[in-house]
Regions:
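Subtilisin-like serine protease catalytic core
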Residues: 132-269, 286
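Conserved short loop/turn motifs at secondary-structure junctions
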Residues: 82-89, 294-301, 312
């Protein structure tokens, strides 16, 4: 049986090498087809698209009528997409004929997709370093302040193994202070409500979502702040440790930015107050601080002389503080 497979493979490769359609087949597919079964099975990348029954799932760009393509290869199954693209499940033996068919422009093997948090950790070699506990690069003893759209404080990644919160403070600038309900703005500030770890833990013990919201009614409507916090400091409890952030043992401080206009975005006043609160907390508790700012705009001269910029320069020199600004600049004027 093995000999017959070997002979068929040699015949297949002879067809691949003698016909002039190689330019229609992408390089990675050709590499997979030229690999031995042992080599292909040993590689997740080379085997992507192939199945144990000798069929391949491939991406095809074609011209003309879809029906013509289907009629030419009746034993293959096609899913026709917009723009003359198609997904085909085809026998490996028929791939040379598919590539030789004039109506076919190009054939490509599918590629695996990964969660970016995993590939980013792999690219930085962070997992290997963190597994060596002697380095201590887990964020332990570090405070990360996420100034954003809020945080899902009940998410398992932001809780300790005993299900208590990792948050040292949650300042929701959108919730009006209500002293009668035990809700106060942070000392020195007039906006929003500051929730302590004790209040958050009480909310986490609530039996229902409604009861939890009565105690700590802070939510992250867009999910952006939760996403950012997960990348920075998620401990992976929700995924059994599979998807962890960069500093899974750090403490967290979250500020949900408010806005003078309920229908608008926060402005730099709310941002500066959030930074100020975070820095003061870190200095008071003598902990190293990392502030993540994923809010911003392209306004100003970019000279570093606006009051916001000079303020950030100033506070970044207080204590052990690192401010990280991450933006996707989608509105860039042309010269």
């Amino acid at each position: 049986m093995y000999l017959s497979k070997y002979i068929r493979r040699c015949d297949f490769m002879d067809n691949m090498n003698t016909m002039d359609f190689n330019q229609k087949i992408d390089v990675s597919l050709r590499a997979s087809l030229e690999a031995t079964p042992v080599e292909r099975n040993a590689s997740d990348d080379l085997s992507t698209g192939s199945s144990s029954d000798g069929f391949w799932n491939l991406i095809v760009l074609y011209t003309g009528s879809p029906q013509t393509l289907q009629n030419e290869f009746p034993s293959s199954s096609f899913t026709f997409l917009l723009g003359n693209y198609a997904i085909v499940k085809i026998s490996e033996d028929d791939i040379p004929s598919l590539a030789a068919f004039p109506q076919v422009i190009y054939i490509e093997r599918p590629r695996q997709l990964f969660f970016e948090i995993v590939s980013a950790r792999q690219a930085s070699c962070l997992s290997a370093i963190q597994e060596n506990s002697s380095y201590g690069l887990t964020g332990k003893g570090i405070l990360i302040s996420v100034i954003d759209s809020g945080i899902d404080y009940a998410h398992p990644d932001f809780c300790n193994p005993d299900k208590t919160t990792r948050l040292v403070a949650l300042w929701d600038q959108t919730i009006l202070a209500d002293p009668s309900a035990g809700r106060f703005a942070p000392a020195g500030y007039s906006q929003g409500t500051l929730f302590s770890p004790e209040q958050i833990n009480a909310a986490l013990q609530a039996d229902t979502f409604e009861q939890r919201m009565e105690l700590v009614p802070s939510t992250d409507v867009t999910g952006h702040g939760t996403h950012v916090a997960g990348i920075a400091a998620g401990n992976g409890r929700a995924s059994g440790g599979l998807y962890r952030g960069i500093a899974p043992e750090s403490s967290l401080l979250a500020v949900k930015l408010g806005s003078p206009d309920p229908k608008g975005f926060p402005n730099t006043i709310e941002l500066m107050q959030a930074v100020d609160f975070s820095v003061r907390y870190a200095i008071e508790h003598t902990v190293p601080l990392v502030i993540n700012l994923s809010f911003g705009n392209t306004y100003g001269s970019h000279s570093g002389t606006s009051l916001l910029e000079t303020y950030l320069d100033y506070v970044s020199n207080l204590g052990r503080i690192n401010i990280v600004v991450g933006l996707s600049l989608i509105h860039i004027s042309e010269p």
